[in-house]
From Swiss-Prot:
Species of origin: Mesorhizobium japonicum (strain LMG 29417 / CECT 9101 / MAFF 303099)
EC number(s) stated in the UniProt entry for this protein: 4.1.1.23
Subunit structure, as described in the record: Homodimer.
Protein name according to UniProt: Orotidine 5'-phosphate decarboxylase
Binding site for substrate: 20, 42, 69-78, 124, 185, 194, 215
Active site residues according to the UniProt entry: K71 (proton donor)
SMART domains in the cross-refs: OMPdecase
One CC-aspect GO term: cytosol
Alphabetical list of InterPro entries matching this protein: Aldolase_TIM (IPR013785), OMPdecase (IPR014732), OMPdecase_AS (IPR018089), OMPdecase_bac (IPR047596), OMPdeCOase_dom (IPR001754), RibuloseP-bd_barrel (IPR011060)
């Protein structure tokens, strides 16, 4: 069984802006400022637990694509029931931690829907020392590739990984699965808490299907110009 993947038709559809903002009011303002430039948004924990789930439904009902970044991980039954309800919300993408049983449960629960399930491989904020600290025997690159194979075999629609690993991941998963890359930073920008970062153009060249960009856009003084500059860089790849 294969979960639905997603094929972007334009560069604009390949840019996902992370609404990493504390309130729905601020997120609404960001969406207004980006109207006509951005058509795909990510909503994660910060906004989700401040009324962002209702906001996600509202945006989705109007045709905006929403990537719900929940990184689900629990026993199979709990993951499946969560996915079943998220399917009803009309979301475009949903993240599941790349544990085989959780992924298989999610794929079964999303069967027949348009929800693209993304396997979270290794957080882009983690480096090799972080992996050692939490007890993994693999370095980030090796674990990303292992989990990419597991996601493919589980029938997931895509994989979330650093753009630094996107080229190797693409070779494993083939041309049809989504390869979604956070940790994107324009050349010369602050890396923040991200450790494995890549520029927008390099991410596209490495085989990423979608780029997730938050702070470089939502924290910019001119969000619209910041988003347009990243789109222009993506087009130059």
């Amino acid at each position: 069984m294969q979960a639905k993947s997603i094929q972007a038709q334009s560069i604009q559809e390949r840019l996902i802006v992370g609404l990493d903002l504390p309130t729905v009011r601020e997120a609404e303002q960001a969406v207004r400022e980006l109207d006509g430039v951005v058509s795909f948004y990510k909503i994660g924990y910060q906004l989700a637990f401040a009324g962002g789930l209702d906001f996600a439904r509202e945006l989705a009902s109007g045709g905006t694509k929403i990537f719900l970044d929940m990184k689900l991980l629990d026993i199979d039954h709990t993951v499946a029931k969560g996915v079943e309800n998220i399917v009803k919300m009309g979301m475009t993408m949903l993240t599941i931690h790349a544990y085989p049983k959780a992924m298989r449960a999610a794929v079964e629960a999303a069967r027949g829907s348009d929800l693209c399930l993304l396997a979270v491989s290794v957080l882009t904020s983690m480096d090799e020392q972080d992996m050692i600290d939490v007890g993994y025997e693999y370095d980030p690159h090796t674990l990303v590739l292992r989990r990419s194979e597991q996601a493919l075999h589980a029938g997931m629609g895509g994989i979330v990984c650093s753009a630094a690993e996107a080229e190797a991941v693409r070779r494993i998963v083939g041309p049809d699965m989504a390869v979604v890359t956070p940790g994107i930073r324009p050349a010369g920008s602050d890396h923040g808490d991200q450790k494995r970062v890549v520029t927008p153009a390099q991410a596209i060249r490495n085989g990423a299907s979608h780029l997730v960009v938050a702070r470089p856009i939502v924290a910019a003084s001119d969000r619209r110009a910041a988003a347009q500059a990243i789109l222009d860089e993506m087009r130059s790849a």
